[in-house]
Amino acid sequence: MSKARFQLYYWPVPFRGCFVSYLFACRGVPFLEETRLEENKRLMDLNPDEQDVPYMGPPVLYDRETGRTLSQMPAIVLYLSPGLDLAPDDPFELAMCMKVLMDCNDVLMEVCRYNGSSMWDYEAWSEFRTRRLSRWMRIFEEGLARGFVGTDRLSFADIGVFALFGNMTRCLPELEADLLRHAPGIHALCRRVGAVPSLALYVADQEKAYGRLYCGGQIEQSIRKMLAQDEANGPR
């Protein structure tokens, strides 16, 4: 029987689950992953009073030592990070790391149009890519300049930034030029965090398993269609 303390439930794509899995990978801590679509869907579709923790969708973390279950990516990250030496001791610095992580979560929601509630049309996509996404990148770049991330002590905020932009530009390489233009320091930070050997190995294994799948489903098809249209239209 595995001695891993934690089991992570998430779809077979990186997207939001990698904000949790990258914590373990960065520290070389073994954990269990349940990525089967049918099992995640079965658990998600249970009535709230039948679930170990009432939730709408994964990621979900099961602590095999305590028997406790937790949902919501930011809550899971906050729970795990002190034990992995990835959380600051100072309360304000901890809150600032959470601010960065919640910003990451907001970007994910915008990219996938609120969990795929609607698909992209080109007018909306162009507005998002040229205005909102570029502003988000500048917000993160300013956070780096102010020391919210990128300090000598690695934090869950640093890993969150890598999970957001490192994964985004790996899976959707058309957006790397945007990141270099608007947030070159964040681009460099992603490279530095992604070079941690145990994390780099995990990401490589994920790519072998899933290719460059990003968020999956119809919404990923919609995003890729918009990027292809951008490419066909020439330089922005």
Question: Where would I find each of the regions flagged by the language model?
Answer:
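GST-like fold's C-terminal all-alpha helical module
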Residues: 80, 92, 99-201, 234
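A generic membrane alpha-helix/interface feature
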Residues: 46, 171, 176, 214-215
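Phosphate-coordinating loops and pocket residues in cytosolic domains that bind phosphorylated ligands
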Residues: 195, 204, 216
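GST-like domain detector, emphasizing the conserved glutathione-binding G-site
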Residues: 1-127, 131-135, 230-236
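Acidic carboxylate-rich catalytic motifs and surrounding loops in phosphoryl-/glycosyl-chemistry enzymes
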Residues: 35-36, 203-209
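Generic structural signal of hydrophobic/aromatic residues within well-ordered alpha-helices
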Residues: 40-43, 50, 111, 189, ...
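C-terminal helix/juxtamembrane-tail motif
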Residues: 207-236
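Glycine-rich, flexible loop segments associated with nucleotide phosphate handling
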Residues: 52-57, 180-184, 222-227
